[in-house]
């Protein structure tokens, strides 16, 4: 699964980092100038690419792969 992190787009990586910082979808949207619904769509794609079921697992994979430090 950690290899799958390499398949994330730059935007998806940015969103993953903001999730790791504890931001809500609305807060992430404000920071990257997207709607909360678009952020939710990005998170769904990240979840699918990584095969994760929740934000905590998504963040753990990001940390282990070095995307999040």
Where in the sequence are the language-model features?
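Recognition helix of helix-turn-helix DNA-binding domains
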Residues: 24-57
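Short helix-to-turn junction characteristic of helix-turn-helix DNA-binding domains
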Residues: 19-23, 62
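Short alpha-helical "packing" element that flanks the helix-turn-helix/winged-helix DNA-binding module
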Residues: 12-15, 19, 58
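A cross-family signal for key residues in well-ordered alpha-helices
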Residues: 17, 30, 60, 69
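Regulatory hinge/linker segments at domain boundaries
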Residues: 1-14
């Amino acid at each position: 699964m950690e290899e799958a992190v390499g398949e994330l787009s730059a935007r998806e990586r940015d969103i993953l980092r903001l999730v790791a910082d504890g931001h809500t979808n609305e807060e992430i949207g404000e920071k990257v100038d997207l709607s909360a619904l678009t952020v939710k769509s990005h998170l769904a794609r990240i979840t699918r690419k990584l095969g994760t079921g929740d934000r905590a697992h998504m963040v753990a994979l990001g940390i282990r792969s070095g995307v999040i430090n």
